[in-house]
From Swiss-Prot:
Keyword Phosphoprotein: no
Name the record gives this protein: D-amino acid dehydrogenase
Entry-linked SUPFAM superfamilies: FAD-linked reductases, C-terminal domain, FAD/NAD(P)-binding domain
Family: Belongs to the DadA oxidoreductase family.
């Protein structure tokens, strides 16, 4: 079949790769001048299935209210005049119950674990390089109450068979030696030894080249305007370079997915949650991380990417703005300087991206009520983690193959 994929982030490119492997003729369309130049460009860098947890969780409403008054809050809410923002927030609050949290986390871990396995297989098949490290990730707790409160997460990890280690200060310093100098800054950690790290931008660009070798065509610098309907199905995509037609269409536009599919009467409750990152060259190896360390207090990930440190995180609900406030940079600087002062922050680059978040934190992967339209979007903070699994899963669904994991609860139908 001829398949057009809208979006060349890590989700769009992985989907293209797996569809091409199954023999389809694939074209990827994007407004940017190359792959992974928006949300996939400078994310935190971890591939962390075990940390696949919903933002909508019990206690979050109370925490969010408290964070409103903190200088270095991990969550910032900036109200807009957009009613979609309020609708999305209300749906998110409805998912902040124990029962919904368990359902959503189980779905997320299922996709994320599968995606990690797909990434391992892809790496073996292609030899792809992207500053990857397979040395686990460490969630670091500065306060005892944080460490005491991981019971629900551990319960789900056990149920899903995800290996983990609860570490004291000495254990944390053993896996991340630079922490030995700052043991007074934390009380313990939760380590997931099977998690990985890597540069999502490098991966996406390398995979795009591999996909081109399989026949995938990329059309960059093309603005996507609308989906055209005829005879009860989509007949084409109106773009700045004319109408593009195919047998099947995949919408992988992240936060911009809802606007495109709204004309089809589809409700995709994906809203942008802005994240920030800085990337600094390493100047002191002894004070740099080995892998990824998640600073639980600030919701920030500090990751080793080759000879660089990537510091990313936080969440800002403020619409589609991509500005770079100095206060957000200050929070990133504070976290990394406190724990891993091995990077040259004066030479760091500062970036922001719009994470496409659903109210239940679970991505939308699968068919729509239109036979020839599919969605692969809404991965939130886990687009990199879930990318390979999401791409392979959707490629199988489009091709009529039985998927390797359960997929019936991942589609857009759960919102209709």
């Amino acid at each position: 079949m001829q398949i057009t994929i809208l979006g060349s982030g890590v989700i769009g490119v992985t989907t293209a790769y797996y569809l091409a492997k199954l023999g389809h003729e694939v074209t990827v369309v994007d407004r940017e001048e190359g792959p992974a130049l928006e949300t996939s460009f400078a994310n935190a860098g971890q591939v962390s299935p075990g940390y696949a947890s919903p933002w909508a969780a019990p206690g979050i409403p109370f925490k969010a209210a408290k964070w409103l008054f903190q200088k270095h809050a991990p969550l910032v809410l900036r109200p807009t005049c957009d009613p979609v923002q309020y609708s999305w927030l209300l749906q998110m609050l409805a998912n902040c119950t124990d029962s919904r949290y368990k359902v959503n986390k189980t779905r997320m871990v299922r996709v994320a674990e599968y995606a990690r396995d797909c990434l391992v297989d892809l790496r073996k098949e292609t030899g792809i390089e992207y500053d990857q490290r397979m040395q686990g990730t460490l969630q670091l707790f500065r306060e005892q109450y944080q460490l005491d409160g991981i019971g629900k997460d551990i319960e789900v990890l056990r149920q899903d068979g995800v290996p983990f280690e609860v570490l004291d200060r000495e254990g944390c310093a053993k896996v991340e030696p630079a922490l030995a100098r700052v043991k007074d800054k934390f009380v313990g950690g939760l380590r997931l030894p099977h998690d990985e790290t890597g540069d999502c931008f490098k991966f996406t660009n390398a995979l795009a080249k591999i996909a081109e070798g399989l026949g995938v065509k990329f059309r960059f610098g093309v603005n996507i305007k609308s989906l055209l309907m005829s005879g009860g199905k989509v007949s084409g995509v109106e773009t700045s370079e004319g109408v593009l037609t195919a047998d099947r269409y995949v919408v992988a536009l992240g936060s911009y997915t809802p606007a495109l599919v709204k004309s089809l009467g589809l409700n995709a409750p994906i809203y942008p949650v802005k994240g920030y990152s800085i990337t600094a060259p390493i100047v002191d190896e002894d004070r740099a991380p080995v892998s990824t360390v998640l600073d639980e207090s600030y919701k920030i990930a500090i990751t080793r990417l080759g000879d660089r440190i990537r510091v990313g995180g936080m969440a800002e609900v403020s619409g589609f703005t991509t500005d770079l406030p100095a206060a957000r940079r200050a929070t990133l600087d504070l976290s990394v300087t406190d724990l891993f002062p091995g990077g040259d922050l004066k030479a760091a680059t500062f970036w922001s991206g719009l994470r496409p978040m659903t109210p239940d934190s679970t991505p939308i992967i699968g068919a729509t009520r239109y036979d020839n339209v599919f969605i692969n979007a809404g991965h939130g903070t886990l687009g990199w983690t879930m990318s390979c699994g999401s791409g392979k899963l959707l490629a199988d669904l489009i091709s009529g193959n039985k998927p390797d994991i359960r997929a019936d609860d991942l589609g857009i139908s759960r919102y209709e």
